[in-house]
Amino acid sequence: SHNLFWLSRYIERVENLARIADTTFKDSIEIESSVKGSKSNNSIWEPVLNNLGYPSDTIESLIDEKDANAILSFINFSSDNGDSIANCISQARENARLVRDQISEEIWRELNRFHLLIRSSRNDEHWQQNPVDFYRKVIDLCMLLSGLINSTILHDEGWNFLQTGKHIERAEKTLRILTLFADKGENHSRSINSTLRSATAYSAYLSATKGSFKPESIYQFLLFAPSFPRSVRYCCRQLNYFLHQISGCPINSFSNPVEENTRNIVAKLDFYNTQNSDKTQLKAYLEPLLEDLDTISNQIFDENNYAMPKFQKPWNSDSSQQTQSQQ
Protein backbone atom coordinates (compact mmCIF):
# COMPACT_ATOMS: atom_id res chain seq x y z
CA SER A 1 0.00 0.00 0.00
CA HIS A 2 2.83 2.40 0.88
CA ASN A 3 4.57 1.68 -2.42
CA LEU A 4 1.38 2.20 -4.44
CA PHE A 5 0.74 5.49 -2.63
CA TRP A 6 4.21 6.77 -3.51
CA LEU A 7 4.17 5.39 -7.05
CA SER A 8 1.10 7.47 -7.84
CA ARG A 9 2.34 10.48 -5.92
CA TYR A 10 5.65 10.62 -7.76
CA ILE A 11 3.96 10.35 -11.17
CA GLU A 12 1.70 13.26 -10.23
CA ARG A 13 4.70 15.22 -8.94
CA VAL A 14 6.57 14.76 -12.22
CA GLU A 15 3.61 15.99 -14.25
CA ASN A 16 3.26 19.09 -12.10
CA LEU A 17 7.00 19.81 -12.22
CA ALA A 18 6.97 19.53 -16.00
CA ARG A 19 4.00 21.88 -16.33
CA ILE A 20 5.50 24.52 -14.03
CA ALA A 21 8.91 24.35 -15.75
CA ASP A 22 7.30 24.45 -19.19
CA THR A 23 5.10 27.48 -18.51
CA THR A 24 7.92 29.35 -16.74
CA PHE A 25 10.34 28.66 -19.59
CA LYS A 26 7.81 30.00 -22.11
CA ASP A 27 7.29 33.09 -19.95
CA SER A 28 11.06 33.67 -19.72
CA ILE A 29 11.37 33.52 -23.51
CA GLU A 30 8.53 36.01 -23.86
CA ILE A 31 10.15 38.37 -21.36
CA GLU A 32 13.57 38.12 -22.98
CA SER A 33 12.08 38.91 -26.37
CA SER A 34 10.64 42.15 -25.02
CA VAL A 35 13.20 43.10 -22.35
CA LYS A 36 16.87 42.64 -23.17
CA GLY A 37 19.17 41.60 -20.33
CA SER A 38 19.50 38.85 -17.78
CA LYS A 39 17.46 40.50 -15.02
CA SER A 40 14.21 39.57 -16.71
CA ASN A 41 15.20 35.92 -16.63
CA ASN A 42 16.25 36.09 -12.97
CA SER A 43 13.04 37.77 -11.88
CA ILE A 44 10.82 35.04 -13.25
CA TRP A 45 12.80 31.98 -12.09
CA GLU A 46 13.60 32.96 -8.50
CA PRO A 47 10.05 32.75 -7.08
CA VAL A 48 9.51 29.47 -8.94
CA LEU A 49 12.63 27.90 -7.42
CA ASN A 50 11.67 29.20 -3.98
CA ASN A 51 8.19 27.77 -4.39
CA LEU A 52 9.61 24.35 -5.27
CA GLY A 53 11.44 24.34 -1.94
CA TYR A 54 15.06 24.42 -3.08
CA PRO A 55 17.74 25.69 -0.64
CA SER A 56 18.53 29.40 -0.90
CA ASP A 57 22.20 28.81 -1.74
CA THR A 58 21.21 26.47 -4.58
CA ILE A 59 18.77 29.05 -5.93
CA GLU A 60 21.40 31.79 -5.73
CA SER A 61 23.91 29.63 -7.58
CA LEU A 62 21.43 28.79 -10.34
CA ILE A 63 20.32 32.40 -10.77
CA ASP A 64 23.93 33.60 -10.91
CA GLU A 65 24.57 31.36 -13.91
CA LYS A 66 22.10 33.49 -15.88
CA ASP A 67 21.26 30.47 -18.00
CA ALA A 68 17.76 29.02 -18.22
CA ASN A 69 19.15 25.67 -19.36
CA ALA A 70 21.16 25.33 -16.14
CA ILE A 71 17.96 25.84 -14.15
CA LEU A 72 16.01 23.40 -16.31
CA SER A 73 18.80 20.82 -16.09
CA PHE A 74 18.65 21.04 -12.30
CA ILE A 75 14.88 20.58 -12.30
CA ASN A 76 15.04 17.75 -14.84
CA PHE A 77 18.11 15.67 -14.09
CA SER A 78 20.28 16.80 -11.16
CA SER A 79 21.31 14.01 -8.80
CA ASP A 80 21.65 16.72 -6.12
CA ASN A 81 17.93 17.47 -6.47
CA GLY A 82 15.90 14.77 -4.75
CA ASP A 83 12.75 16.01 -6.47
CA SER A 84 14.17 16.25 -9.98
CA ILE A 85 12.10 14.65 -12.71
CA ALA A 86 14.76 11.95 -13.14
CA ASN A 87 14.85 11.09 -9.43
CA CYS A 88 11.05 11.05 -9.13
CA ILE A 89 10.71 8.66 -12.08
CA SER A 90 13.43 6.40 -10.64
CA GLN A 91 11.62 6.32 -7.33
CA ALA A 92 8.23 5.74 -8.96
CA ARG A 93 9.72 2.84 -10.93
CA GLU A 94 11.34 1.31 -7.86
CA ASN A 95 8.10 1.54 -5.91
CA ALA A 96 6.36 -0.17 -8.84
CA ARG A 97 9.00 -2.92 -8.89
CA LEU A 98 8.34 -3.68 -5.23
CA VAL A 99 4.63 -4.23 -5.97
CA ARG A 100 5.05 -5.66 -9.46
CA ASP A 101 2.32 -8.24 -8.82
CA GLN A 102 -0.22 -5.48 -8.08
CA ILE A 103 0.20 -3.43 -11.26
CA SER A 104 -0.47 -4.32 -14.89
CA GLU A 105 2.16 -5.18 -17.47
CA GLU A 106 1.08 -2.06 -19.38
CA ILE A 107 1.89 0.20 -16.42
CA TRP A 108 5.25 -1.50 -15.92
CA ARG A 109 6.10 -1.22 -19.63
CA GLU A 110 5.31 2.51 -19.78
CA LEU A 111 7.25 3.20 -16.58
CA ASN A 112 10.27 1.52 -18.13
CA ARG A 113 9.81 3.53 -21.33
CA PHE A 114 9.56 6.69 -19.23
CA HIS A 115 12.74 5.76 -17.35
CA LEU A 116 14.61 5.19 -20.62
CA LEU A 117 13.37 8.51 -22.05
CA ILE A 118 14.79 10.37 -19.06
CA ARG A 119 18.08 8.48 -19.17
CA SER A 120 18.54 9.11 -22.89
CA SER A 121 17.54 12.77 -22.59
CA ARG A 122 20.05 13.50 -19.82
CA ASN A 123 22.99 13.57 -22.25
CA ASP A 124 21.03 14.59 -25.33
CA GLU A 125 21.32 18.17 -26.54
CA HIS A 126 17.88 17.98 -28.14
CA TRP A 127 16.06 18.76 -24.88
CA GLN A 128 18.17 21.92 -24.48
CA GLN A 129 17.31 23.01 -28.01
CA ASN A 130 13.62 22.28 -27.49
CA PRO A 131 12.62 22.05 -23.79
CA VAL A 132 8.96 22.47 -24.73
CA ASP A 133 9.03 19.22 -26.72
CA PHE A 134 10.73 17.42 -23.82
CA TYR A 135 8.10 18.59 -21.32
CA ARG A 136 5.29 17.64 -23.68
CA LYS A 137 6.63 14.08 -23.81
CA VAL A 138 6.94 13.97 -20.01
CA ILE A 139 3.40 15.28 -19.47
CA ASP A 140 1.95 12.91 -22.07
CA LEU A 141 3.60 9.89 -20.42
CA CYS A 142 2.30 10.95 -16.99
CA MET A 143 -1.22 11.25 -18.38
CA LEU A 144 -0.87 7.89 -20.12
CA LEU A 145 0.19 6.25 -16.85
CA SER A 146 -2.74 7.85 -15.04
CA GLY A 147 -5.09 6.43 -17.66
CA LEU A 148 -3.52 2.97 -17.40
CA ILE A 149 -3.86 3.03 -13.62
CA ASN A 150 -7.57 3.74 -14.02
CA SER A 151 -8.22 1.20 -16.76
CA THR A 152 -5.88 -1.80 -16.38
CA ILE A 153 -5.91 -2.85 -12.71
CA LEU A 154 -8.54 -3.90 -10.19
CA HIS A 155 -10.27 -1.05 -8.39
CA ASP A 156 -9.54 -2.59 -5.01
CA GLU A 157 -7.66 -1.43 -1.93
CA GLY A 158 -4.42 -0.99 -3.88
CA TRP A 159 -6.16 1.27 -6.38
CA ASN A 160 -7.60 3.29 -3.51
CA PHE A 161 -4.06 3.91 -2.24
CA LEU A 162 -3.00 4.97 -5.75
CA GLN A 163 -5.85 7.48 -5.83
CA THR A 164 -5.01 8.70 -2.33
CA GLY A 165 -1.42 9.45 -3.34
CA LYS A 166 -2.50 11.20 -6.52
CA HIS A 167 -5.06 13.49 -4.91
CA ILE A 168 -2.99 14.55 -1.92
CA GLU A 169 -0.09 15.45 -4.24
CA ARG A 170 -2.41 17.24 -6.65
CA ALA A 171 -4.04 19.32 -3.90
CA GLU A 172 -0.65 20.33 -2.54
CA LYS A 173 0.67 21.34 -5.96
CA THR A 174 -2.41 23.43 -6.74
CA LEU A 175 -1.90 25.27 -3.46
CA ARG A 176 1.75 25.86 -4.33
CA ILE A 177 0.80 27.14 -7.77
CA LEU A 178 -1.53 29.64 -6.08
CA THR A 179 1.23 30.63 -3.66
CA LEU A 180 3.50 31.23 -6.64
CA PHE A 181 0.72 33.28 -8.26
CA ALA A 182 0.68 35.51 -5.19
CA ASP A 183 4.49 35.84 -5.19
CA LYS A 184 4.80 36.62 -8.90
CA GLY A 185 2.14 39.33 -8.97
CA GLU A 186 -1.51 38.64 -9.59
CA ASN A 187 -2.47 41.46 -11.91
CA HIS A 188 -0.14 40.72 -14.80
CA SER A 189 -1.84 38.88 -17.64
CA ARG A 190 1.24 36.69 -18.10
CA SER A 191 1.10 35.57 -14.46
CA ILE A 192 -2.61 34.75 -14.74
CA ASN A 193 -2.08 32.78 -17.93
CA SER A 194 0.87 30.75 -16.58
CA THR A 195 -0.96 30.03 -13.30
CA LEU A 196 -3.95 28.56 -15.10
CA ARG A 197 -1.80 26.59 -17.53
CA SER A 198 0.42 25.23 -14.74
CA ALA A 199 -2.72 23.82 -13.13
CA THR A 200 -4.11 22.56 -16.47
CA ALA A 201 -7.01 24.88 -15.79
CA TYR A 202 -7.02 27.39 -18.64
CA SER A 203 -9.83 25.89 -20.74
CA ALA A 204 -11.92 24.82 -17.75
CA TYR A 205 -11.57 28.26 -16.17
CA LEU A 206 -12.67 30.04 -19.35
CA SER A 207 -15.65 27.72 -19.62
CA ALA A 208 -16.69 28.27 -16.00
CA THR A 209 -16.12 32.03 -15.72
CA LYS A 210 -16.75 33.23 -19.28
CA GLY A 211 -13.37 34.96 -19.39
CA SER A 212 -13.23 36.93 -16.13
CA PHE A 213 -9.55 37.27 -15.22
CA LYS A 214 -9.84 38.92 -11.81
CA PRO A 215 -7.25 37.60 -9.30
CA GLU A 216 -9.93 36.66 -6.76
CA SER A 217 -11.68 34.61 -9.45
CA ILE A 218 -8.46 32.65 -10.07
CA TYR A 219 -8.12 31.90 -6.34
CA GLN A 220 -11.76 30.92 -6.01
CA PHE A 221 -11.71 28.61 -9.02
CA LEU A 222 -8.52 26.74 -8.12
CA LEU A 223 -9.47 26.51 -4.45
CA PHE A 224 -13.20 25.80 -4.52
CA ALA A 225 -14.44 24.67 -7.96
CA PRO A 226 -16.53 21.58 -7.09
CA SER A 227 -16.15 19.80 -10.43
CA PHE A 228 -12.65 20.74 -11.62
CA PRO A 229 -10.31 17.74 -11.02
CA ARG A 230 -7.38 19.86 -9.84
CA SER A 231 -9.14 22.29 -7.53
CA VAL A 232 -8.15 21.90 -3.90
CA ARG A 233 -11.74 21.25 -2.87
CA TYR A 234 -12.26 18.52 -5.46
CA CYS A 235 -8.97 16.81 -4.57
CA CYS A 236 -9.67 16.89 -0.84
CA ARG A 237 -13.15 15.47 -1.33
CA GLN A 238 -11.64 12.65 -3.40
CA LEU A 239 -8.94 12.10 -0.80
CA ASN A 240 -11.60 11.85 1.90
CA TYR A 241 -13.63 9.41 -0.20
CA PHE A 242 -10.73 7.04 -0.95
CA LEU A 243 -9.49 7.03 2.65
CA HIS A 244 -12.97 5.95 3.74
CA GLN A 245 -13.01 3.30 1.01
CA ILE A 246 -9.80 1.86 2.47
CA SER A 247 -11.06 1.81 6.07
CA GLY A 248 -14.66 0.86 5.27
CA CYS A 249 -15.88 3.62 7.56
CA PRO A 250 -19.05 5.51 6.48
CA ILE A 251 -18.24 8.76 4.71
CA ASN A 252 -20.10 10.85 7.31
CA SER A 253 -17.95 9.50 10.15
CA PHE A 254 -14.27 8.75 10.79
CA SER A 255 -12.28 5.84 12.17
CA ASN A 256 -8.85 7.45 12.70
CA PRO A 257 -7.16 10.88 12.95
CA VAL A 258 -6.40 10.99 9.21
CA GLU A 259 -10.07 10.71 8.27
CA GLU A 260 -11.01 13.23 10.96
CA ASN A 261 -8.47 15.78 9.68
CA THR A 262 -9.43 15.20 6.05
CA ARG A 263 -13.11 15.61 6.86
CA ASN A 264 -12.32 18.89 8.63
CA ILE A 265 -10.49 20.22 5.55
CA VAL A 266 -13.40 19.24 3.31
CA ALA A 267 -15.83 21.02 5.64
CA LYS A 268 -13.70 24.19 5.57
CA LEU A 269 -13.64 24.15 1.78
CA ASP A 270 -17.32 23.28 1.39
CA PHE A 271 -18.56 26.01 3.69
CA TYR A 272 -16.10 28.79 2.91
CA ASN A 273 -18.02 31.94 1.97
CA THR A 274 -16.44 32.91 -1.34
CA GLN A 275 -18.92 35.72 -1.98
CA ASN A 276 -17.54 37.94 0.77
CA SER A 277 -13.85 37.13 0.31
CA ASP A 278 -11.29 39.41 -1.28
CA LYS A 279 -7.95 38.22 -2.62
CA THR A 280 -6.11 39.09 0.63
CA GLN A 281 -8.35 36.75 2.62
CA LEU A 282 -8.02 34.03 0.00
CA LYS A 283 -4.20 34.29 -0.02
CA ALA A 284 -4.16 33.94 3.77
CA TYR A 285 -6.09 30.70 3.35
CA LEU A 286 -3.28 28.94 1.43
CA GLU A 287 -0.61 28.31 4.07
CA PRO A 288 -2.92 26.73 6.69
CA LEU A 289 -4.26 24.36 4.02
CA LEU A 290 -0.73 23.34 3.04
CA GLU A 291 0.06 22.64 6.69
CA ASP A 292 -3.12 20.56 7.07
CA LEU A 293 -2.25 18.46 4.00
CA ASP A 294 1.29 17.95 5.25
CA THR A 295 -0.09 16.69 8.57
CA ILE A 296 -2.40 14.24 6.78
CA SER A 297 0.42 13.00 4.55
CA ASN A 298 2.58 12.28 7.59
CA GLN A 299 -0.28 10.56 9.42
CA ILE A 300 -1.47 8.18 6.70
CA PHE A 301 0.98 5.39 7.44
CA ASP A 302 1.17 5.81 11.19
CA GLU A 303 0.75 2.41 12.83
CA ASN A 304 -2.71 3.30 14.16
CA ASN A 305 -4.08 4.47 10.79
CA TYR A 306 -3.19 2.72 7.53
CA ALA A 307 0.08 1.13 8.62
CA MET A 308 2.05 -0.93 6.13
CA PRO A 309 3.47 -4.30 7.19
CA LYS A 310 6.74 -3.93 9.05
CA PHE A 311 8.62 -6.09 6.53
CA GLN A 312 7.73 -3.84 3.59
CA LYS A 313 10.42 -1.32 2.77
CA PRO A 314 9.10 1.91 1.25
CA TRP A 315 10.89 3.87 -1.40
CA ASN A 316 10.54 7.61 -1.10
CA SER A 317 12.67 10.68 -0.67
CA ASP A 318 11.94 10.89 3.06
CA SER A 319 13.10 7.36 3.85
CA SER A 320 16.49 6.59 5.34
CA GLN A 321 19.29 6.58 2.80
CA GLN A 322 18.69 4.08 0.06
CA THR A 323 20.77 3.21 -2.94
CA GLN A 324 18.92 4.30 -6.06
CA SER A 325 18.93 1.46 -8.51
CA GLN A 326 18.46 1.54 -12.27
CA GLN A 327 20.08 4.96 -12.76
Language-model region placement:
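Alpha-helical transmembrane segments and their helix-helix packing motifs
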Residues: 1-327
